[in-house]
A protein has these predicted regions:
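A short, well-structured edge-of-sheet supersecondary motif
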Residues: 16-49, 78, 118-120, 331-335, ...
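Short active-site loop at a secondary-structure junction
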Residues: 22-32, 46-102, 139-149, 247
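Active-site Gly/Thr loop motif
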Residues: 198-256, 285-338
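Short, gly/Ser/Thr-rich active-site loops of penicillin-recognizing serine hydrolases
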Residues: 247, 268-271, 285-293, 352-373
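Active-site SXXK
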Residues: 13-19, 37, 54-80, 154-160, ...
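Active-site-proximal alpha-helical segments within enzyme catalytic domains
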Residues: 105, 151-158, 246, 250-272, ...
Length: 373
């Protein structure tokens, strides 16, 4: 593997050997790991270490940090009704749902009927108005289902009602600029030269079963899952329009360094000053749901408030860990057990989605070393 950046603390030398043997068909990848506030791994292959790419649902971790900042600053109460901040949300008997319940994927708003259009996705107010008017696809709180796309407009409208700013504006001012990190929700045009477009040359499935995901039923078999999936063209999310807009749920453009820097800024591991009140992050990262996900049609899924939680299906950390993975293989998480922050980006698309399991041995090794010291 052609490395364009090669720094590994000697204590974590095993990580380098694993990284060098990750799938040879990757267009490019980056990996940055911090332990107790110190960078112990900074690796890149086939892309510049400062290049950025679309990280899809890893964007949700950046948005969750933004909401946690509002919680810590006393501007947002997760146990307040969503309709308290956003009265129109009360339509179709949604008025008693709390912010925490809505943003832990329990509201039944994984899609609208009719579907959101590509144009609406890049107009948060249009998308949020459609979601406020939508009758839930299932009885809220009776089950949960991943609001893969729609949680973006839900978060954005909430932030707008509280601050008067879009979530992208608030994140830029309060989070990204403060962390001085290459992790954008809306990447400026002058930085486009540093963007590595997502490769669509080859689909590489993480479980090796390409035939399975080529079948019509694919990896969404339930009616809810079929209706919730495939609402928006992929080109809408990964094109310049998507990169410029920065949909809070799916259009972040980041480097692995940038991801790790934002998370480290937020948590302040290693005795640093946390940019977000620790109790707010702890509250948002507490597990809210676990089990069968209606929208993904998968078992063993779990979420806090926006943040994804590790399970046996996605074992990226201890029960205290929180973060989010992305459809093309990227991952960002923090684990207070060992004070680990990991950012990983991949510049290619693969199904069935989620973080690239090729880095699971790295996650396991880092956790073992970090918790032993």
């Amino acid at each position: 593997m052609e490395l364009t950046q090669n720094f590994v603390d000697p204590a974590y030398a095993e990580v380098l050997e694993i990284f060098k043997n990750i799938k040879p068909d990757l267009k490019g990848s980056q990996l940055v790991i911090k332990v107790k506030g110190k960078t112990v791994v900074d690796l890149a292959a086939r892309v510049r270490p400062d290049s950025m790419t679309t990280v899809f649902s890893v964007s949700k971790a950046l948005s969750a940090i933004t909401l946690a900042k509002l919680v810590g600053d006393g501007k947002l109460n997760l146990d307040e009704r969503m309709a308290h901040y956003w009265p129109e949300f009360a339509a179709h008997h949604k008025g008693e749902l709390t912010v925490r319940q809505v943003l832990s994927h329990q509201a039944g708003l994984t899609a609208t009927d009719p579907h959101l259009t590509d144009e609406m996705v890049h107009d948060d107010h249009a998308a949020s108005a459609a979601l406020a008017a939508q009758k839930p696809l299932w009885k809220p709180l009776s089950a949960f289902g991943y609001h893969g796309l729609t949680i973006g407009p839900l978060m954005s409208e909430l932030v707008f009602r509280i601050t008067g700013h879009t979530i992208q504006q608030y994140y830029e001012k309060e989070i990204r600029s403060a962390a001085n990190a290459d992790a954008y929700l809306g990447v400026p045009e002058e930085l486009e030269t540093r963007v590595t477009p997502l490769s669509m040359d080859r689909v590489v499935t993480f479980d090796g079963d390409e035939e399975k995901y080529a079948r019509p039923e694919g990896f969404h078999n339930s009616g809810i899952a079929q209706w919730s999936g495939g609402q928006i063209k992929l080109d809408t999310l990964i094109g310049r329009g998507g990169r410029a807009f920065g949909l809070a749920s799916a259009e972040g453009v980041c480097s692995a360094r940038g991801l790790a820097e934002v998370m480290q800024w937020a948590v302040g591991f290693g005795g640093g000053t946390p940019g977000v009140k620790p109790s707010a992050l702890e509250d948002m990262s507490q597990m809210q749901v676990y089990g069968y996900d209606l929208a993904l049609d998968q078992e063993h899924r779990s979420f806090g408030t926006v943040f994804q939680k590790p399970t046996q299906a996605i074992p990226f950390g201890s029960y205290k860990a929180f973060g989010h993975d992305g459809a093309a293989g990227s991952l960002l998480y923090a684990d207070p057990h060992g004070e680990i922050v990991l950012g990983y980006t991949v510049a290619r698309w693969a199904v069935p989605g989620g973080y690239d399991r090729a880095i699971q041995p790295i996650i396991d090794v880092v956790r073992k070393i970090a918790t032993a010291n």
